[in-house]
Amino acid sequence: MSSGANATTIDVPETRAEAKGKAPLIAAPIVATTKATPHPNAGWKKGLAIFDFLLRLAAIAATLAAATTMGTTDETLPFFTQFFQFQASFDDLPAFMFFVVATAIASGYLALSLPFSLVSIFRPHAQGIRLLLIISDTVMLALTTAGAASATAIVYLAHNGDSSANWIAICQQFTDFCQSVSGAVVASFIAVVIFMLLVMMSALALRKH
Amino acid sequence: MSSGANATTIDVPETRAEAKGKAPLIAAPIVATTKATPHPNAGWKKGLAIFDFLLRLAAIAATLAAATTMGTTDETLPFFTQFFQFQASFDDLPAFMFFVVATAIASGYLALSLPFSLVSIFRPHAQGIRLLLIISDTVMLALTTAGAASATAIVYLAHNGDSSANWIAICQQFTDFCQSVSGAVVASFIAVVIFMLLVMMSALALRKH
């Protein structure tokens, strides 16, 4: 790791507060020195913040694709009996409903977090914003993972069925339905991976200041 | 938040490195001052680390309970036909198998992480350990959530069935099976909440040093 480079970091407001509290007489020259010297790892932090912003854009694309693909999935089979038509829609299955709601919330959250991510590009040492982002990212990671995993369990069942519980595989009839649902699940797992990366990167950025 | 108290934090090794790099002539008195004064927020950090350790113990209990409850679930109905007996076991359903594996892995990881958590009680400012813990906790949060959510989707189906996919509710027959499976799912969600808390607390602990 780059802890060697980080060891020379100086956080200006903190140094000032610390110096005021402890050694007021030598406070002024220290502050002057730190202000004159550019941050040694500001570039590294800025790179991390820019990557964070780009990852958020990718995650918006992934969650939006997942939510809309799942939310518009609807297949009516071309044959029907006297009493009912065979139709499969995402809102027949509560797990798919939850998936749409969870990925839509994640997508909205990501859009709202973009300005905060932008601020941390220009102020790489603002710890409050980083902390806010890492906490809400953790919650959203859990939400997106829950949506993706529950939908996966149902998609697996739709593909393979389960003989012991007497649940039949419906994908033999509803091929298009199963295909788009599987696509949505894959997109949501991409979003899960991105959320994990976002949390880890925020942790790295919080490490030194 | 306690940012007012944190603003006076001084990290001894970093202050020394920083002082050496920037202003060697006034480095010695500063280090002497900081060494004489105890850490203002060392107690707060230590409390956080102790709470982290206790939460890990609770999470071990929750994941162990979830894994063993699910892993020993097996119900044979008291009636049978000529050809087969009605039996429900967790390993009939892949989602339940995944649940057992995921919670068992989380449980093992938590046991392995205890020594690291202990070290960070005695050395609240060791950032490398915190960073290691937050990154692996994030991965485990995703794993445990995935296991819990996929099992929930199947448990919901077992309780309610799904008319459009023609999947019947099996809980009317397998009442004991469904009860213990539901208990395991609840325990795993407790573990998920604890993992989220662990990640957030590590983020807080990384914030200032």
Swiss-Prot record, chains A, B:
PANTHER family: CASP-LIKE PROTEIN (PTHR36488:SF11), CASP-LIKE PROTEIN 1U1 (PTHR36488). It comes from Vitis vinifera. It is a multi-pass membrane protein. It comes from the Eukaryota. It holds the Pfam family CASP_dom. InterPro entries: CASP/CASPL (IPR006459), CASP_dom (IPR006702), CASPL (IPR044173). GO terms for biological process: cell wall modification; cell-cell junction assembly. The chain crosses the membrane at residues 47-67, 96-116, 138-158, 184-204. Belongs to the Casparian strip membrane proteins (CASP) family. This is Casparian strip membrane protein 1. Residues 1-46, 117-137, 205-209 are cytoplasmic. Residues 68-95, 159-183 are extracellular. Its main location: membrane. The keyword Flavoprotein does not apply.
